Amino acid sequence: MKFVLLFGVLLVTLFSYSSAEMLDDFDQADEDELLSLIEKEEARKDCIPKHHECTNNKHGCCRGHLFKYKCQCTTVVTQSGEETERCFCGTPPRHKAAELVVGFGKKIFG
């Protein structure tokens, strides 16, 4: 009888210890996930929206529905006759086609 009681106490102690470790792991995972979400939100705030100028920061465009916008540049002739480069964040044609196909597929299949 003493052996069963001792074994039961040992089993309860091990179970409570393992469940406490598991809860600590879950708490740590929640904190890590929250920090990564905060970092992603800060990165989103710093990005350049669609159709805005990205001449000075060509890799800072925001994400679209499926793809990240790309900085697209064109050469513009000013009124004084100088050629300058102007860039804006936009969706490349192949990404537009892919988004169209995906959107069409969602409408058909559900």
Swiss-Prot record:
Disulfide bonds: 47-62, 54-71, 61-89, 73-87
Tissue: Expressed by the venom gland.
Compartment(s) of residence: Secreted
Domain of life: Eukaryota
Propeptide positions: 21-44
Chief location: secreted
InterPro entries: Spider_toxin_CSTX_knottin, Spider_toxin_CSTX_Knottin_CS
This protein's UniProt keywords: Disulfide bond, Knottin, Secreted, Signal, Toxin
Protein family (similarity comment): Belongs to the neurotoxin 19 (CSTX) family. 03 subfamily.
Name by which UniProt lists this protein: U1-lycotoxin-Ls1jj
